[in-house]
Amino acid sequence: MKPRPDLADARTMPGVEVFQLTEGPLPNSHVYMEAQVFAPDSKRFVLHGGAYAHGYDHRDPKRKYLLCDLEQGGRLSPLTEEVGACAPAVSPDGRFLYYFVDETAPQDGRLTLKRVGLDGSDRRTLAVLEGPRPETGTP
């Protein structure tokens, strides 16, 4: 983590410190404000890394979710490997990241629900929806 006092201004509350968490050529950003991305202890959280700072192309092979561990000096560890990873959520107990892998296409494709431990272990596929769903009324 790199201290960035230059990002604070006169409106910044006293005692607030600003740090840069990432380095490198690819932009990184928060996932989205209402997403459950913090572990219950607030010492670890998930952020988005990829070719676009805000918004994304879910087919971008550089796009991934990273775990930031503040107790390890802001160390970043990749959590997802798959192209199409989206909609991340940290479990209420803080042990897992749940996410979808979007390989959908009009009238075809697959949507997969996966999970991985925040330590990178116990990677599992939990459910797969393939092709058009009859209950949606699409052929």
Named regions from a protein language model:
Residues 73-74, 121:
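Short coil/turn linkers that define WD40 beta-propeller blade boundaries
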Residues 54-66, 106-115:
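Structural motif
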Residues 44-48, 97-100:
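Residue position within the beta-strands of beta-propeller blades
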